[in-house]
Curated annotation (Swiss-Prot):
PANTHER family: CHEMORECEPTOR GLUTAMINE DEAMIDASE CHED-RELATED. The keyword Hydrolase applies. Pfam families: CheD. Gene3D superfamilies: 3.30.1330.200. GO terms for molecular function: protein-glutamine glutaminase activity. Probably deamidates glutamine residues to glutamate on methyl-accepting chemotaxis receptors (MCPs), playing an important role in chemotaxis. CDD domains: CheD. Its EC number is 3.5.1.44. Keywords: Chemotaxis, Hydrolase. The gene is cheD. This is Probable chemoreceptor glutamine deamidase CheD.
Length: 162
């Protein structure tokens, strides 16, 4: 079997089977949602930018939003034979990358993304077993389909495993 490495861009999602890896870079206020099925060794990763699609009239990319991307990722994994009840989640990102004196104007998008991702996963009844969220550092997230291990490369900190 070939050990593939799949890259997921911003506002994108994808799947990889064992022994492959799937990764996303540039997680600032964005969130990486890693879903893993231990039985089938299928890994899914989503890189969301915004919490809620209902604020927009024309949604051209559902993968941009937590409320749409997570159900879409689950459906793609189910189409490959996963059972939703076997999925576990690990999340990373949601940093406050900029300091604004008046947060009411822009809101803390990182914090809102964290809340939206947790809400969506809870509604889908998928347990978050590990997280590294908040703070003010950018992250790269790598999910290994062999064992579900997530490796984070955090700017100014180094490597963290979830």
């Amino acid at each position: 079997m070939e050990n593939t490495e799949v890259k997921v861009g911003i506002a994108d999602l994808n799947l990889v089977s064992s022994p492959g890896k799937i990764m996303t870079i540039g997680l600032g206020s964005c969130i990486g949602i890693a879903l893993y099925d231990r039985r089938s060794k299928l890994a899914g990763l989503s890189h969301i930018m915004l919490p809620d699609s209902t604020q927009f009239k024309n949604v051209t990319n559902p993968m941009k939003f937590a409320d749409l991307a997570i159900p879409l990722l689950i459906k793609k994994m189910e189409a490959k034979g996963c059972l939703k009840r076997n999925l576990i989640a690990k999340i990373a990102g949601g940093a406050s990358m900029f300091s604004f004196s008046d947060k009411s104007m822009v809101g803390d998008i990182g914090k809102r993304n964290i809340q939206a991702v947790k809400k969506s996963l809870s509604e889908e009844r998928i347990q978050i077993i590990a997280e590294d969220v908040g703070g003010n550092k950018g992250r790269t997230m790598i999910l290994d389909a062999l064992d579900g291990k997530v490796t984070l490369k955090i700017v100014g900190i180094g490597i963290v495993e979830l």
